[in-house]
């Protein structure tokens, strides 16, 4: 059974181990999980995952793997062997890539991480998609990629809260992980398609990724507690 009792995932978006652990030491693993992204992982490698797990945290390894099927599957396998709770891949890598990742996890013994697909990044709007040759609404592309992810056997999707309701209706078995969550009154920063924590859960999100409103708060523990209270 998970030690964490809430849907909150705090993003440890820091350049150094020291900064990340300084924040982690102010957080309660019963109230949140933590996300390790590219900057921190490249700076610290697998050691940061082990250290966070030893502190009681379940770790979402947010590296968004996207490569040929075998290479991506081996990366997912390596993440699983580190003991991460969740790992993600880009759905735009295609059905064969995602299926290879699912299969490599099923061949392992022991606990399996949640395998999550990334649809359309929350910073992207229609004009951004048009710039890469997709002249469609982001939600249309999200639904296309979601169908591929479900067919490949993924456990869930990373998506904007504004896509959550449609995704939950179309794919009720998939767990939805939503970045771009901003408590009421927070700055939007570079996340465009955002909702508050309560709005995101009501829309169908299962896990909420929150970064700067907690990590940059004067009192991160208090900020986390306020989010948890909003969700109660």
UniProtKB/Swiss-Prot annotation:
Active-site residues, Swiss-Prot/TrEMBL: 64
The reaction(s) this protein catalyses: orotidine 5'-phosphate + H(+) = UMP + CO2
Pfam families, alphabetized: OMPdecase
Keywords for the protein's UniProt record, in alphabetical order: Decarboxylase, Lyase, Pyrimidine biosynthesis
Pathways involved: Pyrimidine metabolism; UMP biosynthesis via de novo pathway; UMP from orotate: step 2/2
BP GO annotations: 'de novo' pyrimidine nucleobase biosynthetic process; 'de novo' UMP biosynthetic process
Any single GO CC term annotated in Swiss-Prot or TrEMBL for this entry: cytosol
The keyword Transit peptide is assigned to this record: no
SUPFAM superfamilies per the UniProt record, alphabetical: Ribulose-phoshate binding barrel (SSF51366)
UniProt: substrate binding residues: 13, 35, 62-71, 122, 182, 191, 211-212
PROSITE patterns linked to this entry: OMPDECASE
GO MF annotations in UniProt: orotidine-5'-phosphate decarboxylase activity
Stated role: Catalyzes the decarboxylation of orotidine 5'-monophosphate (OMP) to uridine 5'-monophosphate (UMP).
Subunit details: Homodimer.
Name this polypeptide is given: Orotidine 5'-phosphate decarboxylase
Lineage: Bacteria, Pseudomonadati, Pseudomonadota, Gammaproteobacteria, Pseudomonadales
């Amino acid at each position: 059974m998970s030690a964490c009792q809430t849907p909150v995932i705090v993003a440890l978006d820091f350049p150094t181990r020291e900064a990340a652990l300084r924040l982690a030491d102010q957080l309660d693993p019963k109230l949140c999980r933590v996300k390790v992204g590219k900057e921190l992982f490249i700076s610290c490698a697998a050691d940061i995952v082990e250290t966070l797990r030893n502190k009681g945290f379940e770790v979402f390894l947010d590296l968004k793997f996207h490569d040929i099927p075998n290479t991506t599957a081996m990366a997912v396998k390596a993440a699983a062997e580190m003991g991460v709770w969740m790992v993600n891949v880009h759905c735009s890598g295609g059905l064969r890539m995602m299926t290879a990742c699912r299969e490599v996890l099923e061949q392992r013994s022991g606990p399996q991480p949640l395998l999550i697909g990334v649809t359309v990044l929350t910073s992207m709007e229609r004009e951004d998609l048009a710039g890469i040759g997709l002249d469609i609404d982001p939600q249309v592309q999200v639904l296309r990629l979601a169908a591929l992810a479900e067919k490949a056997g993924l456990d869930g999707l990373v998506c904007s809260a504004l896509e959550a309701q449609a995704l939950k209706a179309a794919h009720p078995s998939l767990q939805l992980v939503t970045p771009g969550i901003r408590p009421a009154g927070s700055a939007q920063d570079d996340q465009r398609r955002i909702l508050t924590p309560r709005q995101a859960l009501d829309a169908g999100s299962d896990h909420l990724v929150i970064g700067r409103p907690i990590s940059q708060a004067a009192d991160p523990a208090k900020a986390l507690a306020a989010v948890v209270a909003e969700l109660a």
